[in-house]
From Swiss-Prot:
<protein>
    <recommendedName>
        <fullName>7-cyano-7-deazaguanine synthase</fullName>
        <ecNumber>6.3.4.20</ecNumber>
    </recommendedName>
</protein>
<keyword id="KW-0067">ATP-binding</keyword>
<dbReference type="GO" id="GO:0008270">
    <property type="term" value="F:zinc ion binding"/>
</dbReference>
<keyword id="KW-0862">Zinc</keyword>
<keyword id="KW-0671">Queuosine biosynthesis</keyword>
<dbReference type="InterPro" id="IPR014729">
    <property type="entry name" value="Rossmann-like_a/b/a_fold"/>
</dbReference>
<comment type="pathway">
    <text>Purine metabolism; 7-cyano-7-deazaguanine biosynthesis.</text>
</comment>
<dbReference type="GO" id="GO:0016879">
    <property type="term" value="F:ligase activity, forming carbon-nitrogen bonds"/>
</dbReference>
<dbReference type="Pfam" id="PF06508">
    <property type="entry name" value="QueC"/>
</dbReference>
<feature type="binding site">
    <location>
        <position position="193"/>
    </location>
    <ligand>
        <name>Zn(2+)</name>
    </ligand>
</feature>
<feature type="binding site">
    <location>
        <position position="196"/>
    </location>
    <ligand>
        <name>Zn(2+)</name>
    </ligand>
</feature>
<dbReference type="GO" id="GO:0005524">
    <property type="term" value="F:ATP binding"/>
</dbReference>
<dbReference type="InterPro" id="IPR018317">
    <property type="entry name" value="QueC"/>
</dbReference>
<feature type="binding site">
    <location>
        <begin position="7"/>
        <end position="17"/>
    </location>
    <ligand>
        <name>ATP</name>
    </ligand>
</feature>
<feature type="binding site">
    <location>
        <position position="185"/>
    </location>
    <ligand>
        <name>Zn(2+)</name>
    </ligand>
</feature>
<comment type="similarity">
    <text>Belongs to the QueC family.</text>
</comment>
<keyword id="KW-0436">Ligase</keyword>
Length: 230
C-alpha cells in the first residue's frame, strides 16, 4: 500500500511513519505550517523523512491559519496546564484543522498515485478534538471517495483511531522509533514544558506502556498530579 503520512514531528505521527515504513510502502511525509507556536515540531518531521529516506513536503498554511483564530496554538493565548481530559484544553482546538490538512493531503496523494493517506489520530484525542473521532474520519473518507470518483482511489489509514496513546508508544518501540527525536510540547520552548496537555499525555503514555521516556521536561513530575486530578 503506497502511503503518504501526515507528520507533524510529534510522537504519534513519527511512530506512524516508522510503522508504515516497516509494514507498507512509505512514499513520503507531508507537514503543515499553519502558524503554530510550536513550529519547531516541523524540524523533527523533516528529520524523520531524512531518516526514513523519503521526501518531505512542507505546506505553507500560515495565511489560512491566521484566520483560524481563537486557539492557544496559533494566537496570543496562554496554553493551559493540565490533562487533555479537562474542558480548559478546548482552547487548543484549531477549527477544522484536520479537515483542511487531509483535503490537501488527499489531493497530493491522488496526484502521486498513492493508495492511502495515513494520520495518527488516536483515542486520547476524542474528548477534545472532534476532527480526530471515528465519525469524522469515516465521513471524510466517504467524502473523498466522491471527490475523487473516477480519478483515484485513496483510503484513509488510521490505525490508532481506537487506541490510547500508550499503544502508540508500544507500537513505536516495536518499530524502533527514536522517541527522543520527536516533539510534542505546545509551548514550543527549549525543552518540553512537562505541564501542557500534550506533555502530560506524552509522559503518561510512556508510563502506561512501561517504556522509558527519553524526553527532558522542564517540570518532569507535574504529570502525576495532573493525572490524579482528572
Amino acid at each position: 500500500m503506497k502511503t503518504l503520512v501526515i507528520c507533524s514531528g510529534g510522537l504519534d505521527s513519527v511512530s506512524l511513519a516508522h510503522k508504515v515504513a516497516a509494514e507498507h510502502d512509505l512514499i513520503g511525509l507531508i507537514s503543515f505550517d499553519y502558524g503554530q507556536r510550536h513550529r519547531k515540531e516541523l524540524d523533527f518531521a523533516a528529520r524523520a523523512a531524512t531518516r526514513l529516506g523519503v521526501p518531505h513536503d512542507l505546506i505553507d498554511m500560515r495565511q489560512i491559519g491566521a484566520h483560524l483564530s481563537g486557539s492557544a496554538l496559533t494566537d496570543d493565548v496562554d496554553v493551559p496546564d493540565g490533562h487533555y481530559a479537562e474542558d480548559t484544553m478546548k482552547i487548543t482546538v484549531v477549527p477544522n484543522r484536520n479537515a483542511i490538512m487531509l483535503a490537501i493531503a488527499f489531493g497530493i496523494a491522488a496526484a502521486k498515485q498513492a493508495d492511502a493517506v495515513a494520520t495518527a489520530v488516536h483515542g486520547g484525542d476524542h474528548f477534545i478534538y472532534p476532527d480526530c473521532r471515528p465519525g469524522f474520519t469515516q465521513a471524510f473518507e466517504a467524502m473523498q471517495a466522491q471527490a475523487l470518483d473516477g480519478y483515484a482511489s485513496v483510503r484513509l489509514y488510521t490505525p490508532f483511531v481506537h487506541e490510547p496513546k500508550s499503544a502508540i508508544v508500544t507500537e513505536g518501540e516495536r518499530h524502533n522509533t527514536p522517541f527522543a527525536d520527536t516533539w510534542s510540547c505546545y509551548k514550543g520552548g527549549e525543552v518540553h514544558c512537562g505541564r501542557c496537555g500534550t506533555c502530560v499525555e506524552r509522559r503518561e503514555a510512556f508510563h502506561l506502556a512501561g517504556v522509558a521516556d527519553p524526553t527532558p521536561y522542564a517540570d518532569p513530575e507535574f504529570w502525576r498530579a495532573a493525572v490524579e486530578g482528572r
